[in-house]
Curated annotation (Swiss-Prot):
The gene is recO. One of its GO terms (biological process) is double-strand break repair. Belongs to the RecO family. InterPro entries: ARFGAP/RecO, DNA_rep/recomb_RecO_N, NA-bd_OB-fold, RecO, RecO_C. This is DNA repair protein RecO. It comes from the Bacteria. Keywords: DNA damage, DNA recombination, DNA repair. Involved in DNA repair and RecF pathway recombination. GO terms for cellular component: bacterial nucleoid. It comes from Vibrio cholerae serotype O1 (strain ATCC 39315 / El Tor Inaba N16961).
Length: 241
């Protein structure tokens, strides 16, 4: 049972029976929680339009099993204005949290990172920095502690101009070869600071987070990523034609 109304966002919703919904929500104090919203799809339900992703909510629930029962719901404000690539980016963030975060593990810091990422997506002209910062925050919240600033082999500080090879769960060691597993020192420093000043640094951060998140996703593709590809590829082809 929740202790009063909780700040939440809907990560995913799916219909259940004729009039109900099953919700995966991300709450500030309880982490990821699964709720049964009885009658939420009914014609007379005042919750019909409120239980949507990207809408800040206050929710209260009861129950001790893996699926709780929603008892009260109030929207805090209107949903965040997301469309196009920014909407797909936000859907990707939701799917990541739903897929990799353990249920009912309090993550108030990550909740704030999530809210900040959605706000950034609603206001920015480039979704990539917000996505990379959130992926790194998610990895940190799961205890994925990689030292980007020191060589795993020697403990020496990373040099901006040197090349380093990533070793899963261990860190980075100096390397003379360049491939998909290697990064320049300045890229590692940018990832550590979550501050990206060049396209190359953003691309390096994307490579790293994909490598680091891969074990948590279990080889199952992300639906949001595939949906984005299906939507954008036909548009790109028509532009070329």
């Amino acid at each position: 049972m929740s202790d009063g109304l909780q700040r939440c966002f809907v990560l995913h919703r799916r219909p259940y029976s004729e009039s109900s919904l099953i919700l995966d929500v991300f709450s500030e104090e309880y982490g990821r929680v699964t709720l049964m919203a009885k009658g939420a799809r009914g014609k007379r339900s005042n919750l019909k339009g409120a239980l949507q992703p990207f809408t800040p909510l206050l929710l209260k629930w009861s129950g001790n099993g893996s699926m709780k029962t929603l008892r009260q719901a109030e929207p805090i404000s209107l949903g965040l204005p997301l469309s196009g690539v920014y909407l797909y980016s936000a859907m990707y963030i939701n799917e990541l949290v739903d897929r990799v975060l353990m249920p009912e593990v309090a993550s108030p810091g990550l909740f704030h990172d999530y809210l900040f990422a959605l706000t950034e997506l609603a206001q920015s002209t480039n979704p990539e920095p917000a996505l990379r910062r959130f992926e790194l925050a998610l990895l940190a919240a799961m205890g994925y502690g990689v030292d980007f600033l020191h060589c795993a082999g020697t403990g020496e500080p990373v040099s901006p101009d040197m090349t380093y090879r990533y070793r899963e769960q261990k860190g980075f060691i100096a390397s003379v070869r360049r491939d998909n597993l290697t990064f320049l020192g300045n890229e590692l420093i940018a990832i550590s600071e979550r501050r990206f000043t060049s396209k190359e640094q953003l691309q390096a951060a994307k490579r790293f987070t994909r490598l680091a998140l891969k074990p948590y996703l279990g080889g199952k593709p992300l639906k949001s990523r595939e949906l984005f590809r299906q939507t954008t590829l036909p548009r790109a082809r028509s532009t070329e034609e």
